[in-house]
């Protein structure tokens, strides 16, 4: 009931995508979330709390820009900490090393594709929603392309509906190497 109420009030595609699917994540992605959480909690938040306390000691808070900004920044940090905590609590860490030697596409795979319709070759890594980074070739496992790739092997063809129209791909290579090796 709570989820239905939230969906009716906030029909965002981001909310529904995050609520409907498990939060699969690679060990590297989880470490990145944890590092951000630790940096905010152990370093940035205490500094802002100290700044707010100093600003509050200066007297009138109604026109105290340091105090007003500090309180706003503290709310932003606390909001981000809550978000990170929820994402880490819901995380299902999947180590791609456990899938070494598999020729099928699953979570964590590096997939080299030949885009038949444009005569181009692309390499993508299928990762969790919190790891999405198109500049590195990281695509979310719930994206249309990644979902169409699941279970495919080298030599398989697939068609994917994209905002620019239908694209046809051929799987050239599937690999489960670590990101450092790429």
What are these regions (language model features)?
Residues 3-17:
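Short, Lys/Arg-enriched N-terminal segments with co-localized hydrophobic residues
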Residues 16-20, 102:
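Extreme N-terminus of proteins, especially the signal/transit-peptide cleavage junction
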Residues 20, 85-88, 131:
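Acidic-enriched and Gly/Ser
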Residues 21-83:
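N-terminal, charged amphipathic alpha-helical interaction modules
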Residues 37, 41-44, 88-92, 153, ...:
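Conserved NTP-handling cores and scaffolds of large molecular machines
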Residues 56-59, 88, 149:
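Hydrophobic residues in alpha-helical segments
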Residues 80-99:
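Structured, basic alpha/beta domains of bacterial-type, RNA-associated proteins
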Residues 94-181:
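Non-DNA-binding regulatory cores of transcription-related proteins
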